[in-house]
Amino acid sequence: MNSQIQFTVNASSVQNVQHKNYTKEVSYEILNYDPANVTSDTGIYRSIVVNPDTKEVFSFAPPKSTTLSEFAEKFPCIEDSRFQMNEIIEGTMVNLFYDSRISKWEIATKGAIGGNYWYYRNSYDGDNKPQLTFRQMFLESLGYDKNTDFANVEL
């Protein structure tokens, strides 16, 4: 049985949420909070990828983290012993999603679709070492060759 749940989002009335249109094979809209004005309401917009026409959600990155003191202030009736807290792992989050419009898997980082770009956009040390794109690193993390087409990846 193949069932699917569809979510939509309406961020047009939320202040301090940036809307970025992105076109690859099809069009996407990426919703991100404004880092200078992040609030508890906008923190859920760390990176949401939607269909720009229907607002169907394709990818929803975990919301912005909060400090223990902020959490305790917001939820004073919850005891610390009921939760496990982990250290934040720094790095670029890569989100995998399925786009039913084109029947393909795709990846997104916070600000773009596809992963065909580098963490270091320029070479500062002059060695011009070859860099792997986020897409290539993602493929290698799954045990595939860096140039494998997503259509040939068992997900």
Named regions from a protein language model:
Residues 1-155:
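Core nucleotide-handling region used for phosphoryl-transfer chemistry
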